[in-house]
Structures are given as C-alpha cells and as structure tokens.
C-alpha cells in the first residue's frame, strides 16, 4: 500500500485538475471523506470537481462544499486524475462508471476489503471508516488538518461506526475521533445539523413506515417500506436518508430489519442487523454490499416483487445460519 500512496502523492503533485467521486446513494462516510479530500487538495492549489450519481442534498448541505457536486461536466480528458472515495465497486459510480474506467490515471481510496480493484491504483485498508484512511493519507502528505477537513472526516467516522455503536467501532475509531476533535472538528454541528435534524415531513413519513412495517416473529426480521406515493404525500425528497430507520426494529428484538425505498430508478434497500448477523451476504445476492451490519442494494423491479425477493433471501440466510 505504501507504493500506491507514493503513486497517489506523485500524481497529485503533477495534476492540475482532479475529479473526486462518491458512491451512488451516498452515506456520511463517502460524502465526509470526499469533502475532506476536496478541501485538502484545494490547499495544494488544485482545481477539484465533485461527482456523484445521486443528487447530494438534505442534511448533507450543512457541509457547504456539497453544493458543488455535479456542477461540472465529467469528460475524462479534462482531468489529470480521478479518485473514487469509499467506492467498493465500479457499479457504485453509476453513470460515471464507464468514463472513470477509461481514465489512465485513476485511484480508488477505500476501506472495503472485498471490493473490486477497478482503478489503476487501489489504496485499500480495512478500517472502521474510509474517513480514517483519508486522515492517515493526509497526515502522510503533511497537510495541516483544520476544521474544514476535520469536521467532514468526523461526519464520515460517525456514519460508518453508527455514531460509535456498531461492530466496526474499535479503539482506532476513538483515537481518530480524538485527533479530529483536537484539530477543530465541529462535533456539535455534525450531530445537530446531520444526525438530529429532521423536518416535520420526514417525521410523519418515518412514522408511517414504522407503523406499517411487516414483521416475522418466527424468523425475527422486519420489513419497512417508503413508497413513491408516500414520498409525494409527505413531500419528502427521494434522496432524504431513511437508511437507519430499520434500527428501531433491532431495538425491539428483531435480528434483521430492512427498508425498501421506492424511487424513480428502482427499489433501494437498506439492511441493518444485530452484531451476529451478516446482512452484506443478503445484499450481495442483489449485486449490492457494504458492511456486516449495514448494507444496501438496488433492485430493478416493482416494490411488491422486491419485497418478495428480499424476504426470500432473508429467510434463506437465516435458515442456513440457524446453527
């Protein structure tokens, strides 16, 4: 990995224009890590553009840099290097996949060990969040980590550790959090503006999803839905993050919970599970993935069919892991 980091540093030094990519249906880690890298590269005097298949809005906008996503047109020839941040597979680049793969100076910075090495140079380290890896790289680059870098990295770290509650949380997570705090991370703002802030419309829609959840008391799992009709009824943007809603049912004694979000481009599934249950195995059946206790995928079918397929795979997984 040291060789690849040296290659990254050399490419950054020689580049003038750099494109950074977050994965589709972004989570706090891919957004926070990308924004932190943007601010660091800007300190190097680089011109940096941000790209994401999915519109970045909602609570992410407390990081004002997110307003720059997809403002520029991505033409490979216009950029000296391209970097995918927290992107496990090239499919997660969405419409940018083909052009990214064509670029001869591409990098992937990620913490998903089981991902695809789709970039020309892959920098992958197993750690609780991609934000940790970005932190290490920036320290190696001797970049001064100030509030503009520390705050988005803290967002990313909180996101992938479930605010320091999930199985991926370890001593390193707290060590990095401490260092980011010392560097000026605005912790209160991350909690208030991202994790705690909700509109009345979102509260009403989440209440509806929770009240109408289907539960299986034999297999101990719950299925929640966010229908296209309800997105419209409650005036909630499709890109509003409801991925952690299933956690409510885990606290009620269920081992696996999933929310199926009916959007224009398909059914987006967000799986959550208790520590002993690996939902990445289920998500992978549909071409998705992620972490053991938090994974996702997308199905190109109706909500009814998606629910049927997901329930089938959850039961298959639970049956095969009964002992």
Language-model features: locations:
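An acidic intrinsically disordered interaction segment
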Residues: 1-6, 98-106, 126-134
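Short, motif-level signal for alpha-helix interfacial/capping segments enriched in acidic residues
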Residues: 2-7, 88-89, 138-140
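Generic enzyme active-site microenvironment
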Residues: 21, 25, 84, 108-109, ...
């Amino acid at each position: 990995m040291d060789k690849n980091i040296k290659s990254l540093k050399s490419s950054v030094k020689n580049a003038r224009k750099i494109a950074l990519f977050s994965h589709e249906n972004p989570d706090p880690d891919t957004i926070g890590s990308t924004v932190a890298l943007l601010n660091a590269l800007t300190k190097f005097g680089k011109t940096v553009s941000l790209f994401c298949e999915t519109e970045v809005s909602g609570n992410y906008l407390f990081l004002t840099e997110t307003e720059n996503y997809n403002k520029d047109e991505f033409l490979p020839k216009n950029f000296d290097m391209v970097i995918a941040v927290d992107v496990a597979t090239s499919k997660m680049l969405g419409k940018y996949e083909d052009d990214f793969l064509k670029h001869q100076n591409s990098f992937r910075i990620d913490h998903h060990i089981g991902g695809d090495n789709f970039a020309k140079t892959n920098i992958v380290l197993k750690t609780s969040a991609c934000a940790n890896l970005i932190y290490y790289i920036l320290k190696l680059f001797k970049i001064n980590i100030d509030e503009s870098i520390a705050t988005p990295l803290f967002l990313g770290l909180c996101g992938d550790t479930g605010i320091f509650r999930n199985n991926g949380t370890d001593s390193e997570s707290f060590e990095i959090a401490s260092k980011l705090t010392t560097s000026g991370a605005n912790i209160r703002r991350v909690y208030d503006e991202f994790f705690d802030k909700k509109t009345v419309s979102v509260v009403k829609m989440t209440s509806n999803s929770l009240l109408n959840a289907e539960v299986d008391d034999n297999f101990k799992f719950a299925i929640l839905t966010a229908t296209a009709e309800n997105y419209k009824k409650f005036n909630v943007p499709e890109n509003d993050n409801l991925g952690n809603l299933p956690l409510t049912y885990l606290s009620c004694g269920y081992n696996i919970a999933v929310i199926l979000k009916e959007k224009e481009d398909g059914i987006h599934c967000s799986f959550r599970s208790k520590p002993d249950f690996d939902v990445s195995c289920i998500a992978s059946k549909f071409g998705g993935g992620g972490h053991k206790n938090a994974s996702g995928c997308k199905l190109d079918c109706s909500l009814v069919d998606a629910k049927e397929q997901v329930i089938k795979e959850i039961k298959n997984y639970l049956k095969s892991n009964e002992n």
